[in-house]
Curated annotation (Swiss-Prot):
Residues 90-100 have a biased composition (Low complexity). The chain crosses the membrane at residues 214-230. Belongs to the protein kinase superfamily. ADCK protein kinase family. This is Atypical kinase COQ8A, mitochondrial. Autoinhibited by the N-terminal domain, containing the KxGQ motif, that completely occludes the typical substrate binding pocket. Nucleotide-binding relieves inhibition. One of its GO terms (biological process) is phosphorylation. Residues 1-162 form a transit peptide. Atypical kinase involved in the biosynthesis of coenzyme Q, also named ubiquinone, an essential lipid-soluble electron transporter for aerobic cellular respiration. Its substrate specificity is still unclear: may act as a protein kinase that mediates phosphorylation of COQ3. According to other reports, acts as a small molecule kinase, possibly a lipid kinase that phosphorylates a prenyl lipid in the ubiquinone biosynthesis pathway, as suggested by its ability to bind coenzyme Q lipid intermediates. However, the small molecule kinase activity was not confirmed by another publication.
Length: 648
């Protein structure tokens, strides 16, 4: 009899669920959802409970044996958020969670519109495992839970407490489950906007030895060779459209989309100096690299692979000592960002303050020279570098810059200096350094909220204008007032917080100083360009050793035209429209001439300076900013001349 009753229970419950599914499908087909679906589910849940009560009472008279009963309508839907439909999210949350709970991870998922993809509401922090899945604070929850037939909480309309077969509410929890619940309670309540690791990032050990890193570059070289052959064959069968616009690097068959994928995969794996070069490619405009390739290279900014837990812990123990966790209340073992030199983890200090811990990849500092040499071998073999770039000079500069970036103690000092310089600024702020958790390979700062500027396109025109205006003013102040500049224009180094309406400045590893001897001449070149004075630009360019004075006329004209084009933004009192300007296209047409006829490499300072200034203009272009620039430069120029006079 008991077996028959059990079968009847299962049959009736199955019929009720089938009816619910059919009704929901029909309602969704008719475009009805929300409260109506909630009502249907509530009726189904009540019906299930009534059936359980009736058969439970009969069962209690027949036998003490227990049968299945469900405490929730859909336990998987309540505890396994990643598979839920967006349109029913509000109904499911209201049914399965208390009102005090923070929004689930999908509330700001990458698929939503506007700037939301850049950050996530991360209150229920993810367990180590599949990104985007939220874990129950009680550990793993099965699709069915055992319940007592005489459960006093099983009355209709009341949510029943779940019991196991041993009549204990804790009987089925393992030590691991209890520990997870304890950690979940200790986790910090995160800020409303938090950076998330790219879905392309994978956990892979950083190749530390020189041979291990060389093997990756060797595999890349072979792959590029086969990819180039395939690209040549494809182009021979389908000639390019002669009317189409080409970027500077489009002429190389080695830089096809397939090869770009190969390069990005290798760079994200080896990280370090090689990935840094890839990040430089990721912030170029259409004139230098076509949009399809730029989109591929864009992944290297936030989708570098991250270290396995064991390798990461070894770095922390070696640098901070074995008891470094004693200073923390919580530490997130999965990073929320991974870049060229290191990866960033969320943590919380004992006092409750949330911090970001940047941990350097092992072997990166020691492998700079070999990485650069290996990468240059691949690039030279594939003929990717146009003539006239003076790669030897460029690589020497890159080596020195990377060596400085690998010194986290130097970066901490630069961040403190910038924080002091901008302490009273109404729009920018620099996160505070946490000295007790800093070392040559670990850098800890306070956690900032917001999203990077490449995700700010959905903001209003007024806010975008204000952001870009302040960035250009800061760029001029760094060069001509501080003479101390953060030269990495990666969009992820500028985080906009819509709640504070401020931009946080991050990553000061690429910070450098500029001598007065350089800035005295450079500001005169910019001034002459703003005034469209070709003779003054030529004179100062020779003084700065941009030119020797012996260049052919074509090279001289191309150089002067390029500088005058760059000065156009500072030449007019009318608002300059960065979104529709043709500056990059005009310069793009001059690059082949300059690469062909250049006699000397540009001054060393200009590599990092032009990277920063060009990146700042690209931010303005991407955000389609529109504002007058002449007054900002005139103010910078007059202030510079005043300080110059005071110091004489």
């Amino acid at each position: 009899m008991a077996a028959m009753l059990g079968d009847a229970i299962m049959l009736i419950k199955g019929f009720v669920k089938l009816t619910q599914a059919a009704v929901e499908t029909h309602l969704q087909h008719l475009g009805l959802s929300g409260e109506l679906l909630m009502a249907v589910r509530a009726l189904q849940s009540t019906a299930t409970e009534q059936v359980g009560m009736v058969f439970g009472q009969v069962q209690g008279q027949e036998t003490p044996e227990e049968y299945y009963s469900e405490s929730l309508d859909d336990p998987e839907g309540a505890f396994h958020f990643s598979g839920m439909r967006a349109e029913s999210a509000s109904a499911d949350v209201s049914a399965a969670s208390s009102p005090e709970q923070s929004p689930p991870p999908w509330a700001h998922a990458a698929g939503s519109e506007g700037p939301a993809p850049a950050y996530v509401a991360s209150a229920p922090f993810r367990e180590g495992g599949v990104l985007g899945q939220a874990a129950s604070p009680l550990g793993r929850v099965n699709g069915r839970l055992f319940a007592s037939p005489r459960d006093p909480f099983s009355a209709p309309g009341l949510q029943r407490r779940v019991y196991h077969q041993d009549q204990s509410s804790m009987g089925g929890l393992t030590a691991e489950d209890i520990e997870k619940a304890r950690q979940a309670k200790a986790r910090p309540e995160s800020k409303p906007h938090k950076q998330a690791l790219s879905e392309h990032a994978r956990e892979r050990k950083v190749p530390v030895t020189r041979i291990g890193r060389l093997a990756n570059f060797g595999g890349l070289a072979v792959g590029l060779g086969f990819g180039a052959l395939a690209e040549v064959a494809k182009k021979s069968l389908r000639p390019d459209d002669p009317s189409g616009k080409k970027a500077v690097l489009d002429s190389s068959p080695f830089l096809s989309e397939a090869n770009a994928e190969r390069i990005v995969r290798t760079l994200c794996k080896v990280r370090g100096a090689a990935l840094k070069l890839g990040q430089m490619l990721s912030i170029q405009d259409d004139a230098f690299i076509n949009p399809h390739l730029a989109k591929i290279f864009d992944r290297v900014r936030q989708s570098a692979d991250f270290m396995p837990l064991k390798q990461m812990m070894k770095t922390l123990n070696n640098d901070l000592g074995p008891n470094w966790r004693d200073k923390l209340e919580y530490f997130e073992e999965r990073p929320f960002a991974a870049a060229s030199i290191g990866q960033v983890h969320l943590a919380r200090l004992k006092g409750g303050r949330e911090v970001a811990m940047k941990i350097q990849y092992p072997g990166v500092a020691q492998s700079i020279n070999s990485d650069v040499n290996n990468l240059m071998t691949v690039l030279n073999m594939s003929n990717m570098l146009p003539e006239g770039l003076f790669p030897e000079h460029l690589i020497d500069v890159l080596r020195r810059e990377l060596a400085l970036e690998c010194d986290y103690q130097r970066e901490a000092a630069c961040a403190r200096r910038f924080r002091e310089l901008l302490k009273d600024h109404p729009f920018f702020y620099v996160p505070e350094i946490v000295d007790e958790l800093c070392s040559p390979h670990v850098l800890t700062t306070e956690l900032v909220s917001g999203f990077p500027l490449d995700q700010a396109e959905g903001l209003s025109q007024e806010i975008r204008n204000e952001i870009c205006y302040n960035i250009l003013v800061l760029c001029l102040r760094e060069l001509f007032e501080f003479q101390f500049m953060q030269t990495d224009p990666n969009w992820s180094n500028f985080f906009y917080d819509p709640e504070l309406h401020k931009v946080a400045l991050l990553d000061f590893g690429a910070t450098r100083e500029f001598d007065r001897s350089f800035t005295d001449l450079y500001i005169q070149i910019i001034r002459a360009a703003a005034n469209q004075d070709r003779e003054a630009v030529l004179k100062k360019s020779i003084e700065m050793k941009f030119l020797t004075g012996y260049e052919v006329k074509a090279m001289e004209d191309a150089h002067l035209d390029a500088i005058l084009i760059l000065g156009e933004a500072f030449a007019s009192e009318e608002p300059f429209d960065f979104g529709t300007q043709s500056t990059t296209e005009k310069i793009h047409n001059l690059i082949p001439i300059m690469l062909k006829h250049r006699l000397v490499p540009p001054p060393e300072e200009t590599y990092s300076l032009h990277r920063k200034m060009g990146g700042s203009f690209l931010i303005c272009s991407k955000l389609k900013a529109r504002f007058p620039c002449k007054a900002m430069f005139e103010e910078a120029y007059s202030n510079y001349c005043r300080r110059q006079a005071e110091q004489q």
